[in-house]
């Protein structure tokens, strides 16, 4: 699932492609991508609107229009796909060999911006304002923003009795972390993912804060170099494999102490950690 670094890389790559362009036409190929909204709402708000800015909030891509906005949420497998023109859109959308599962497409002044998801979990919504979007409006402090200070983070930790891993996944507390970077941050901070958030002392809290920022920044660099390939659904994961220290490394020796990385289940998700290093 794309997390903060991947979504930020998409935003930075999209800006020069779509910013300032007008949406000429909207194609909704699979209505499930806009539910519970109606396809007509998306079409009505977006058609003939100009994309003023491309921004990010947590794991959401925001296309700020001259009136209203569009939110793109990738969920597990959603991705942005770029087409040269309408002809390529329909050719690739209908191709069995090199096809993509396009749910929604926006024909722009130059090029076509598509939103694809083979599982149809991702969502594209139209809103008149940010406050109208319950998902975006409830998001907590962004993990790469200047507001995410060590002091702010410590206060959030102190107010929660949840296990650290579950706390980090709560987007209403800290926005942007998912399963991958929560595991990685806890490994770098040498903290047991099962510990209660409020149990961390001052030094441990600062260590985790530093690890989160460092892990996300390094991952973002990997996502941007080379630049995102909007034709490869797994572009974001390829470069990350070389920097991951815990995630998806069950049974492999810990890069610090040599003890095998373990996998446990927390909140229905896999957590990877070192039982010797992480206390």
PLM feature spans:
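Basic, nucleic-acid-binding surfaces and adjacent catalytic neighborhoods in DNA/RNA-processing proteins
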Residues: 22-42, 55, 90, 154-279
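Generic detection of long, well-ordered alpha-helical segments
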Residues: 1-4, 143, 147, 201-209
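Phosphate/anion-contacting hairpin/loop surfaces
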Residues: 70-176, 181-188, 196
């Amino acid at each position: 699932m794309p997390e903060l670094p991947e979504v930020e890389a998409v935003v930075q790559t999209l800006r020069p492609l779509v910013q300032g362009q007008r949406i000429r036409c909207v194609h909704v190929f699979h209505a499930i991508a806009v539910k519970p909204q109606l396809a007509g709402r998306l079409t009505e708000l977006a058609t003939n609107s100009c994309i003023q800015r491309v921004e990010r909030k947590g794991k959401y891509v925001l296309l700020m229009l001259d009136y209203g906005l569009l939110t793109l949420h990738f969920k597990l497998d959603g991705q942005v796909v770029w087409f040269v023109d309408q002809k390529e859109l329909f050719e690739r959308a209908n191709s069995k060999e090199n096809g993509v599962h396009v749910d929604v497409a926006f024909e722009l002044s130059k090029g076509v911006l598509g939103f694809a998801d083979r599982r149809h979990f991702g969502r594209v919504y139209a809103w008149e304002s940010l406050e109208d979007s319950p998902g975006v409006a409830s998001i907590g402090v962004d993990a790469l923003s200047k507001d995410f200070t060590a002091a702010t983070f410590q206060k959030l930790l102190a107010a929660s009795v949840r296990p650290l891993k579950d706390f980090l996944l709560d987007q209403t507390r800290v926005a942007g972390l998912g399963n991958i970077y929560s595991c990685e941050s806890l490994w770098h901070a040498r903290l047991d993912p099962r510990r209660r958030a409020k149990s961390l002392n001052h030094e441990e809290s600062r260590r985790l804060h530093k690890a989160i920022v460092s892990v996300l920044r390094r991952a973002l660099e990997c996502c941007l170099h080379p630049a995102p390939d909007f034709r490869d659904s797994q572009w974001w994961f390829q470069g990350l494999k070389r920097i991951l220290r815990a995630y998806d490394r069950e049974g492999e020796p810990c890069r610090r102490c040599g003890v095998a990385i373990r996998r446990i289940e927390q909140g229905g998700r896999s957590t990877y950690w070192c039982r010797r290093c992480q206390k």
